[in-house]
Amino acid sequence: RREVGIGYGWTMRITFGLMAAGGVVVGLLVDPVPVREAFGIGVVAATGVALVVSWQRRKAGVAGQRTEEERRSTRVAEMTGIDKDAQRFDRNVPEFPPGLDLLAPLLGLVALVAAGIDAGDPVLLALARTLVGALFLGAVSDAMLLGHWYLVQPGLARAPIIELVNWTAILWPYELLVLLWPTGMLSVLSGTIDDGYGGMLGWYWVASTVATILLVGATRVTLRERQYSAVMAATGLLYLAILTAFGMDLVARATLA
């Protein structure tokens, strides 16, 4: 749709680029895996290139945002007789090519596959948990970041954040499935695997799992309200959903390790 402001792309690239860089550093210090680290460095480099290109072409804005700004300014002028200055864009500057943002996740996919293969036996289970977990945590994190962007771009339609919330809800059962896949969290809950805390971590995981989908559902319901404050309320709920989603994923990984 090309309607989210170009600054949101900067937010995404900086946030996930730093995460990737941190992952590479930790991997090199703790348990180096050559393919994983090499492609992790590639992710950081590709993210940096996309960020630089986006900054160089910032005056172009994005097509959908330009159209919306012009429409709103025209409407205000017609209703009030006041010719309000719209945000100015330079049409002579080429837009940022969105395809450039695909390189980092493609390189990241290779790094994740390498990480999954190295994680242990069975390989298929490790790969599934690694890839599904990355998609799930990425979706909920992206949704929370986008919720904050509505403060910067208040005229933005709700379709983008609703789409991300929907993706989080869609991915939740798959995340649950791969964490239950034997040997999984059912073994922790039954006591076959000792979590070291008398079963408390297992029930904490259950609480995090249930709370995550409830918070995502509450976020979706909140976004049906017409008031603009509903977006801010949804962002607050997504804050909590991130905490419980990471609890759902990381507690299971730590316990099953």
Residue positions per predicted region:
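Membrane-helix boundary/interface segments in integral membrane proteins
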Residues: L186-Y197
